[in-house]
């Protein structure tokens, strides 16, 4: 089976957006018009094809990025057929990890905004993440049929809040309930949709007279932005020659790929208007896999930087970006192929230096699947039955190993204890949690040594809620869930020196190890550094890693109330060993005991996670919101107005944010919303530290 579409006709893109900007609806419509799902699924009634997990259907938010393949011919079907791989990204802040992960494998993105609100807090977060991965993107201002929708205000928010340069390609005709079509500035015509054909049919007419001046003004702005991309076009334009449509499209494409500006489109996916122009723009302006730089990695044998060209003949390299449990196929690993050709039955090398056999290979459509024998560079495939691969791993040809950059995953800030209700649930719970942790690297599972409880940790209350819920539904595990706990940390109060000797004599060979360490608290976020300053072999080389291991393990178990001690520097300055009695174990025990002595001598300060909280509220509740945040030990960082709403930014300890969503809804009548993400660890005030100690004791 040969390649069906040349690489330049591939578009791997995602739709990124704030919770309610209509991302799933837009994806649904794309699938409908590209002919893959024949009945339009509405999120309002929980049937969208992309949202295939039960919880998503209930909550109406997208949780997992399903990858879907569809085909599209631009220019009303006259253009060459393109293959679109759409990666659905979640828009809720507890799932930013999923967003990071999908951005890593996209070539381009469409940012969808709500036509009333414009750029919202979460849109900014996702936009910054896309900046980090240098993803070329365009904007789709959606929901223009809503009361209060204002296209021009939204364009202004792209400038004010994202600092981006918008290149407007379409203007809306009519607003709110009278919204009926678009002015196409590139082709200088109006597009009107027919409601009775579910928006599948539309016709062209002249630009309405009342919009003629506005259209001329916006087209001129667009042309000026475009000609800046090319010296010849610029000179011609200054001499009074306006580029023709084909040239204009080329220049817009160039500017989009260079991220000089972002094309702006508009419509209402729910009312089936503006989706076809959006698809045409994806084809015309977003990058193909050939337009993005070669994927970078490291050669594991030489540890030198290496790269792979996007071509079927290059050695195979691919990145696993998502693992999901599919009720019919079992575990599915979604992977993006950057280079080479993948055939069913072949063996690949995983980062862990294990061999993986490719069994079933599937192309996913929201929830139907097609078996394939072969896949090529640029494809996004789902692989069944991989044993060793986790999210973020590279799979590559065994004769040409490469490790594509690892993704970075944030540390979890909130934890819960879960206990199985019955003995039968115990075993199932273990399996369920390990599967869920394999799917989602921002979710951790551990056992509390003292109480024997299972602790799960994640990025926020919603994140853990959904995971516990999935455990019940997918794995049929009934569990009692404890109250959420804050992931506190401990830190050393002052620098200390410790000289510790571990000695044990019990007939035969004993144990002996002596270590001298200087330990000092470091900057917040610096982690634990271990510096070996042993001179003259006082501790043999092979025992030094054991000292470090012992000290790190003791730090992990904490001292005051059992939370890990973080951010300090250990200098191993001296020590002693015995020819017969010394061993790796003896030095590990010495390291562990030395660390405990360090903690006792230096004294411990308790640290708590502080969250960056942003509340968007109508003006009249502003006083209540600020008062409430202050009562939660919050520090107000600033306020700002956004359209007709006010934004309050504050730093608030996580311990005081539990249940905030319900409280906020009650005193703002459900009209305010907030986002919260981890900012940093900070020392806990003494009175609070005493309370925490008493509670944990």
Curated annotation (Swiss-Prot):
Q: What is its main location?
A: cytoplasm
Quote any Pfam family the record assigns.
EFG_IV
Domain tr-type G per the UniProt entry, residue ranges: 8-290
Q: Which domain of life is it from?
A: Bacteria
Could you state one GO cellular component term attached to this entry?
cytoplasm
Residues binding GTP? 17-24, 88-92, 142-145
Q: List the molecular function annotations (GO) for this entry.
A: GTP binding; GTPase activity; translation elongation factor activity
| Record-level GO BP terms | ribosome disassembly
Where is it located?
Cytoplasm
This chain's function reads: Catalyzes the GTP-dependent ribosomal translocation step during translation elongation. During this step, the ribosome changes from the pre-translocational (PRE) to the post-translocational (POST) state as the newly formed A-site-bound peptidyl-tRNA and P-site-bound deacylated tRNA move to the P and E sites, respectively. Catalyzes the coordinated movement of the two tRNA molecules, the mRNA and conformational changes in the ribosome.
Q: Which family does it belong to?
A: Belongs to the TRAFAC class translation factor GTPase superfamily. Classic translation factor GTPase family. EF-G/EF-2 subfamily.
**What protein name does the entry list?**
Elongation factor G
Which organism was this protein described from?
Sphingopyxis alaskensis (strain DSM 13593 / LMG 18877 / RB2256) (Sphingomonas alaskensis)
